[in-house]
Amino acid sequence: MRSGVIAQKVGMTRVFTETGEHIPVTVLKLGNCQVLAHRTTEKNGYVALQLGSGARKTVYMPKAERGQFAVAKVEPKRKVAEFRVSEDALIPVGAEIQADHFVVGQFVDVTGTSVGKGFAGGMKRWNFGGLRATHGVSVSHRSIGSTGGRQDPGKTFKNKKMPGHMGVDRITTLNLRVVQLDVERGLILVEGAVPGSKGGWISVRDAVKKALPADAPKPGKFRLANGGEEAAAPAAEQEGV
């Protein structure tokens, strides 16, 4: 199981195929996504990589947090996240993961925070039908109606769909196809929409419900901290060794 990456949502556009068809895509940008630390079974009870992305000032950063970046010998990061990996998929600390960590045509799962909508009624939030337009209904056309029973059960059950705050939820969209890659600018173009607003942080992983392409680099495609580039072999070649 390979590591994912931390990216920022740039926005949506479209790309054209050779036959003239257009594909709506979301542009994701890797902002110096580096490995900060390893999580091992012996020390932590599980295996994972801690990644960081984006730039952050150290003026108001806690001293303990500054120390973590100092140990990893990397610049302070705006966004930090962990990705579970297998033992053979660990990437050296300080390495920067490149956009060609993924390959064109493979499927990925993306996770982000949905756009906030504020307080919303039942019709907008849960797609309720509302009450009738006439025949005795006054003022309450967009209300949700009854919220429970009568004396029995005598309460409104938990998780009842009602008006309330909408959006700002952690959303994962499965099986988005990688359409294009721009390694020099660190761009990943995936087909379809991605949750979140422009500039929002997005986690991109190999799709859980789709097979990993044979030409996908394993443990990944990254640039070492000393400036050297690690040309990882495709998974199929490593299995044949």
Curated annotation (Swiss-Prot):
It comes from the Bacteria. One of the primary rRNA binding proteins, it binds directly near the 3'-end of the 23S rRNA, where it nucleates assembly of the 50S subunit. One of its GO terms (molecular function) is rRNA binding. Keywords: Methylation, Ribonucleoprotein, Ribosomal protein, RNA-binding, rRNA-binding. It comes from Rhodopseudomonas palustris (strain HaA2). Pfam families: Ribosomal_L3 (PF00297). Belongs to the universal ribosomal protein uL3 family. This is Large ribosomal subunit protein uL3. Residues 139-164, 215-241 are annotated as: Disordered. The keyword Signal does not apply. Part of the 50S ribosomal subunit. Forms a cluster with proteins L14 and L19. Residues 225-241 have a biased composition (Low complexity). The modification N5-methylglutamine is found at Q151. GO terms for cellular component: cytosolic large ribosomal subunit. Methylated by PrmB. One of its GO terms (biological process) is translation. The keyword Ribonucleoprotein applies. InterPro entries: Ribosomal_uL3, Ribosomal_uL3_bac/org-type, Ribosomal_uL3_CS, Transl_B-barrel_sf.
